[in-house]
A protein has these predicted regions:
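Secretory pathway targeting signatures of secreted, lumenal, and periplasmic proteins
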Residues: 89-142
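Signature of long, low-cysteine stretches enriched in small and polar/charged residues
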Residues: 1-29, 140-194, 208-209, 218, ...
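Short, flexible beta-strand-to-coil junctions
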Residues: 31-34, 109-111, 119-123, 172-173, ...
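Short glycine-rich, low-complexity/disordered patches
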Residues: 55-72, 142-155, 229
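Charge-rich, low-complexity N-terminal segments
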Residues: 50, 54-76, 102-112
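N-terminal "mature-domain start" segment
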Residues: 66-96, 222
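Surface-exposed amphipathic alpha-helical segments
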Residues: 30, 37-64, 92, 196-229
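Contiguous hydrophobic, core-forming segments of folded domains
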Residues: 32-34, 40, 44-51, 82-84, ...
Length: 229
């Protein structure tokens, strides 16, 4: 216990430590007088504690995702089209591109993972029902082989770095492969009035677990930032 707490104030009721017993490990310590005080501490700081663990997990996943580097040439295409950069793995290739709209659909091999990027009006994505209508129509125009299923649709919001991200999740069907899987859409507000950038991720891996793959795509999506990498 002394080893764990030696670098923290004795009266600190809550602290986070890293790499105590193993690398890439995070430990949360709570000091309280009794069970009631501990319960109150967790209640007051629960979201912060969870975020610390989430950030550690995402950091480890991000290091693994980009262990072979970043596809600078493809990231520069994203930058040229949208004025924003996106970190991508070296094996991603362009499936479909339109610099006028602009629109970009990229992917990598089996298990198939796709990422699409396009712009839309912010006003189209302020209301949940309206947002799904516009998304269906925009996918139909940009990626006709992608159909959004009615079986599952979910929306959520969470604060990002200086911006509120709007997230849509669902199930898609892919006509050409006669299969489908989970997808998400991250909606980023830009500095331009009434404009958003939509970064979508799709996993196509029939009969296999997809949670880790979709999470990896989400980590990639969240690397979107203004200007060059």
């Amino acid at each position: 216990m002394a080893r764990i707490t030696k670098n923290h104030k004795k009266d600190a009721s809550l602290f986070i430590l890293e790499n105590i017993y193993a690398n890439n490990q995070i430990l949360c310590g709570i000091h309280s007088l009794d069970a009631i005080a501990m319960e109150k501490e967790i209640e007051n700081n629960g979201e912060w504690i969870l975020n610390e663990f989430r950030n550690m997990v995402e950091s480890r996943m991000k290091n693994k995702i980009f262990k072979h580097g970043i596809n600078d040439s493809l990231s520069n295409v994203v930058l040229d089209y949208f004025g924003y950069s996106l970190d991508l793995q070296p094996d991603y290739k362009i499936i479909k591109a339109d610099s006028v709209k602009p629109f970009l659909w990229i992917g990598r091999g089996y298990p198939y993972r796709w990422i699409s990027v396009h712009k839309s009006k912010k006003e189209n994505y302020l209301q949940k029902d309206l947002a799904w209508t516009y998304l269906v129509n925009e996918f139909a125009e940009l990626m006709p082989s992608i159909k959004i299923s009615e079986f599952y649709k979910n929306t959520a919001n969470y604060p990002g770095e200086g911006i509120n991200l709007h997230i849509m999740r669902g199930i898609y069907e892919h006509d050409e492969s006669e299969s489908g899987g989970p997808f998400f859409v991250y909606i980023f507000e830009t500095e331009t009035h009434n404009e958003v950038i939509l970064v979508s991720g799709f996993v196509n891996y029939p009969g296999h677990e997809k949670n880790l793959l979709i999470k990896q795509l989400e980590i990639i999506a969240k690397t979107l930032k203004k200007g060059a990498t």
